[in-house]
Each structure stands twice: as C-alpha cells, then as structure tokens.
Amino acid sequence: MAHNTTRVAILFGGRSAEHDVSRASAANIFRSLDASRYAVTLIGITPEGRWVLADAVNARTAQALTVPPDGPQIVLLPAGQGRALVLGDGAAAPRELTFDVIFPVLHGPNGEDGTMQGALELADVAYVGARVMGSAAAMDKDVAKRLLRDAGLPIVPFVTMTAAAPVSYEDAVHAVGCSELFIKPANLGSSVGISKARTPQEFAAACDLALRFDGKILIERCISPVREIECAVLEHADGEVKASELGEIVPASSHGFYSYAAKYTDASGASLHVPAQVEPGLAQRIRKMATEVFGVLCCESLARVDFFVHGEEVYVNEVNTLPGFTNISMYPKMWEATGLPQPALMDALIAHALARHARLRQLASQR
C-alpha cells in the first residue's frame, strides 16, 4: 500500500426503512473511489444495528452491497481517531483497523439524523457529511420547515400530527388551505410512507401508514400543477459552497407523485432531466436559494435541496444531507452535468472531511 493512500471506511445498510437504498448507494460510491488513492474497508450495518466487516462478500462490480448478518463484528473506539477492533473473525485476539476518514452512506433514521454523526464525533474521526446539528435539523422536516420559515424562505403550508395529538381531515384542510393533502413521516426519506389524500377516508389511511414509520408526521398542502426541481450543494475543503446545475423529476402519470415505487421499483416510474429546462433567471434564483438553505440548516459537506416550482413561485420542499448515490440518483448526476464527475466528487467530499477534522482538532477543548 502506498504511503499516501487514504484509508476510507464505507458505512452502509443501517437500522432504517432505507436500508436497501443505502446498499445501492454504497455500491456506486465504492466503484467511484479511485483504488490507487483510497484503501477501502466496507462496514455493513445490519437491520438490527450490528456493525460487521463486509469486505469478503462484496466486489466493486456489485449493484448493491451485501451486509453479511454473521460477519465479523466491528467496534469503533471512542476517541480512537479512526481506530476500530474486529471481533470474531477467527483470530486469537481482536484485530485492529485504522481509518483516516469514514463515509457514512446511510439514509434515514440512525444514519442521516445526527445519531451516527454524534458517534463519529465521539470517535474523533474525520467523516463525510454534515455534523450533528445540520444532520438533525434537516432530517426532521417539521423542524427544518420552521427554521426555513423563520429565515424568510418559502415553504409549503403544513401542520404536524402525532398519535397522541391527532388532527382531523377537516382541521388539516383548514390549516393548510387545501382539500388535497400530502401526508409523510417527518423523519424519513426516499418517499417511504408518503401518500396523497383527498377524502377523510384516504386521510385516515395515509396517517396510519405514515405513523408506521415515524411518531411524528407532516401534513402538507398539495401544490398543483408543480415541477419538482432539485439542486446539489457541495462545500469544498476551503469552505467554498457551490450549487450545481438543476435537475427535474417528472413522475409518470400512473404514480401521480415521486413515490418509493416510482423511484426504485418501476423502471418507467419517472423521467429525470439533467440539466432541467428552467429559465435562466429562475434557475439562478433556485441555486441561490439552495445555498441559503444550506446555511440556514447548518449543513456542511453536501446536501441535495428539493424544490416545488409553481409558475414563478418557488417553495423549499426538503433537504437531504446524505442524498442517494444510486445509479439513478440526482445528486451525482447534477454534479456530472456541472462538470464534476463522480470520482472527482468523491475526492472533494473526502478532502472536505479531512480538512474539517483537522480544523476541529485545533480548537481548544480544555482551559
């Protein structure tokens, strides 16, 4: 191994309804990392939350990485600066691994919501993505929308609901000013658990579905007609924040909106347009708004900012601090269209993680 090779651990899988999306994203990232520059270790997280060494069961050609349920367990050491122990691989004593940077390719709860970021902070290791505050703020759509609204950024009218504090269809319609509603879990992505409701019966079923995935759900006004426009944001190692060319998602009429099935299980579920055909002045407004959103929510490293466009009106929909990197995912496609191919994007993300960690270690932690 060359002396200047960077040791990267890819975390994937996880205790989340987006476990399978994570496995596909991680495979794409694994293929994109230059083998001459990076020594990669694959760490799978089972649906039960167990960390396992996954190198032996995965190849760079895989379309989705495998999490071996009985693989050797990995334990990341607190304050270990990237040191980890491998348990149960047949060795007489625990084996030690060391990483320079960790790439958490984890979507949804227990990976994108600040919990993993907190663990990595305690491990004192460089990692890709937003820190605890940005991850948590962006993941909770209720909190994110309140912060964006307070900052003067446009959002779709919404109301929140929990099982302990239910909201009737009539009250929701009155609150958001529309009889056609979207219901979604507050802390989930990949369109998991999202439904559209136009009647009290549909509303009740939609709330029951969303509450299966989260204790808090969001009820939003349905904007129609609408264009779903996305923008990728990237922070470089020197702190410069840039916005990409825009992308547009056009769901098939059979789906009605960009559902989980339209994204991942139906090859004809949606058409993706990168770059999006948006009037230059409007496109510039959206890109500027994307970087503002990035700052308001304390994002770092990377984020995908999703917008609804209704005529000349632009609404911030949501922010993903660990966006998908599957073969169909928009974040890498938008940077590709901007002139940054995925291997160079990986370089930029890892460089940012290393530079940030070095800066943070220089801050005084004791008097």
Curated annotation (Swiss-Prot):
Cofactor stoichiometry and binding remark: Binds 2 magnesium or manganese ions per subunit.
Q: Name one GO cellular component term.
A: cytosol
Q: List GO BP terms, alphabetically.
A: cell wall organization; peptidoglycan biosynthetic process; regulation of cell shape
Q: Where is the ATP-grasp domain?
A: 145-351
Name the EC number(s).
6.3.2.4
Residues annotated to bind Mg(2+) 2: 318, 320
List required co-factors.
Mg(2+); Mn(2+)
Which Pfam families does the entry link to? Dala_Dala_lig_C (PF07478), Dala_Dala_lig_N (PF01820)
Q: What pathway is this protein a component of?
A: Cell wall biogenesis; peptidoglycan biosynthesis
Q: Which PROSITE patterns match?
A: ATP_GRASP (PS50975), DALA_DALA_LIGASE_1 (PS00843), DALA_DALA_LIGASE_2 (PS00844)
Q: Which UniProt keywords apply?
A: ATP-binding, Cell shape, Cell wall biogenesis/degradation, Cytoplasm, Ligase, Magnesium, Manganese, Metal-binding, Nucleotide-binding, Peptidoglycan synthesis
InterPro entries for this protein: ATP-grasp, ATP_grasp_subdomain_1, D-Ala_lig_Van_CS, D_ala_D_ala, Dala_Dala_lig_C, Dala_Dala_lig_N, PreATP-grasp_dom_sf
Q: Which reaction does it catalyse?
A: 2 D-alanine + ATP = D-alanyl-D-alanine + ADP + phosphate + H(+)
Protein function: Cell wall formation.
Q: Kindly provide the name given to this protein in its UniProt entry.
A: D-alanine--D-alanine ligase
